[in-house]
Amino acid sequence: MKNVTDSFVSLVHWPSAGSFGFNTDILATNPINLSVVLGVLIFFGKGVLSDLLDNRKQRILNTIRNSEELREGAIEQLEKARARLQDVQIEAEGYRAYGYFGIDEQRHESINSTYKTLEQLENNKNESIHFEQQRAINQVRQQIFQQALQGALGTLNSCLNNELHLRTISANIGLFGSMKELTD
């Protein structure tokens, strides 16, 4: 341990001529170097510090503005809440003056109105279901009719050949000829 301490002490007291060592004497350091370093720090640091302070000032001002706006909004909401409270208190006084009979009557009216509304909704639902069923039935009928018609046309087209077609035309001409003779 003593060797480590001795080596550190000898390093501190190392002769300054031609060698490197720690200079613990602050008065012996070069004042010009210190003043240059401090001058550079002050010159460049002043701008950075000024920008930091300006940014901080703007953030504080914005925070204050936002706080003022929030405070005004809160005051406005508080006034609305107070007005609503007064309205509710007046309404409550009216209910107290009207008595429980009026409240019970209003409750029955509300229940009856709700039942009527539900009944109307049920009727509307049933009508909608019936309408949709009829529409679906009509669509199915149309599709069946179209398929039957297409099937009949397909069958006729596949069964008719030129010879059968000519015989049918000749038979119809003969039928029309005999009908003409009867009418004359």
From Swiss-Prot:
It is found in: Plastid, Chloroplast thylakoid membrane. The chain crosses the membrane at residues 27-49. CDD domains: ATP-synt_Fo_b (cd06503). GO terms for molecular function: ATP binding; proton-transporting ATP synthase activity, rotational mechanism. InterPro entries: ATP_synth_b/b'su_bac/chlpt. It comes from the Eukaryota. It holds the Pfam family ATP-synt_B. Keywords: ATP synthesis, ATP-binding, CF(0), Chloroplast, Hydrogen ion transport, Ion transport, Membrane, Nucleotide-binding, Plastid, Thylakoid, Transmembrane, Transmembrane helix, Transport. It is a single-pass membrane protein. One of its GO terms (cellular component) is proton-transporting ATP synthase complex. F-type ATPases have 2 components, F(1) - the catalytic core - and F(0) - the membrane proton channel. F(1) has five subunits: alpha(3), beta(3), gamma(1), delta(1), epsilon(1). F(0) has four main subunits: a(1), b(1), b'(1) and c(10-14). The alpha and beta chains form an alternating ring which encloses part of the gamma chain. F(1) is attached to F(0) by a central stalk formed by the gamma and epsilon chains, while a peripheral stalk is formed by the delta, b and b' chains. Belongs to the ATPase B chain family. HAMAP family: ATP_synth_b_bprime. F(1)F(0) ATP synthase produces ATP from ADP in the presence of a proton or sodium gradient. F-type ATPases consist of two structural domains, F(1) containing the extramembraneous catalytic core and F(0) containing the membrane proton channel, linked together by a central stalk and a peripheral stalk. During catalysis, ATP synthesis in the catalytic domain of F(1) is coupled via a rotary mechanism of the central stalk subunits to proton translocation. Component of the F(0) channel, it forms part of the peripheral stalk, linking F(1) to F(0). In plastids the F-type ATPase is also known as CF(1)CF(0). This is ATP synthase subunit b, chloroplastic. It comes from Oenothera elata subsp. hookeri.
